[in-house]
């Protein structure tokens, strides 16, 4: 089946699909203070989703393209779940968030199919994959249309990988007690086995969202990157997120000696946001298998255990947490009790001495990850490094922070 036909098959014009903002039925605790964060974007009045411009631009989307799609959503007069929220248009039609971003992705998909130059075609496929992922954002469980967009993103990503520099291999990993999971191993030019970074992504992202990290930071230094989806989304959708948050990544780590392209004696883990929860658990539980662990904006304790901090977090992010935990209709109180169990301090890990070198980067006044969480990580390590990233200029400092983190990882791997 061609990519175009797959799009037509998946996205048949139906209006009975559940609208994203209705999928998690928690008690809404009213108006929220505005939130701005480098890694998560910011709350904008009249939008359910956080608008994550920095990360979308970093992944290769033109700012004007973002505004164009937003404008189409705003201008729609179709029925909405909440008339006050632009991105709650019901059904797969004009104005619906998933429809508009997927339509934009199809434009790039068609460009990719028409392009004769393999490199340029690969770029267009990658662009389409990123747009399909934005269509599926924030990847809530049970969002049928979003899951279809994710399927198209994965297909586009595979097409891109065949044309872009280096080599990408799709790999299947067995996990006892459940379904196998699929990961992508990105390898630079040259002969392996390669030192490798195991990517632990955020809860509101897909594993295919991190190609820029590999291409700009790891590949130029001869470092491979292995990604898997977080539990409950994408290729890991059959696994629920549990307090043993690192379960899937642990099984991948244990399988690396059998992967000929990976130097299993030179492996690091890198965690974004809740992915840092996974990475730090690995630092404690699998220290012989890891040379280093780096974190960025870690969610390891405060957000999971502090009610005041949770009150500052946008509804969408709490919906993401509830969705990953399988608590779609739980009260806020039940969600708070469950989240507390995911704190690595409550679990008795953080605060204990850890032999694995750990770096943690943070932004001051980050509503999701206060400085204290990063200090807790680095002070627990026998070789810890704390990295403050200034907020403005946000894009330049984000890039500089990633370069410093890559330098630190490289010294411990190469």
From Swiss-Prot:
Similarity section: Belongs to the FrsA family.
Record note on quaternary structure: Forms a 1:1 complex specifically with the unphosphorylated form of the EIIA component of the glucose-specific PTS system (IIAGlc).
HAMAP family in alphabetical order: FrsA
Pfam families (alphabetical): FrsA-like
Protein name (record): Esterase FrsA
Gene that this polypeptide is encoded by: frsA
Species in which this protein is naturally found: Escherichia coli (strain K12)
Record keywords: Hydrolase, Serine esterase
Organismal lineage: Bacteria, Pseudomonadati, Pseudomonadota, Gammaproteobacteria, Enterobacterales
NCBIfam families linked: PRK05077.1
Keyword Nuclease among record annotations: no
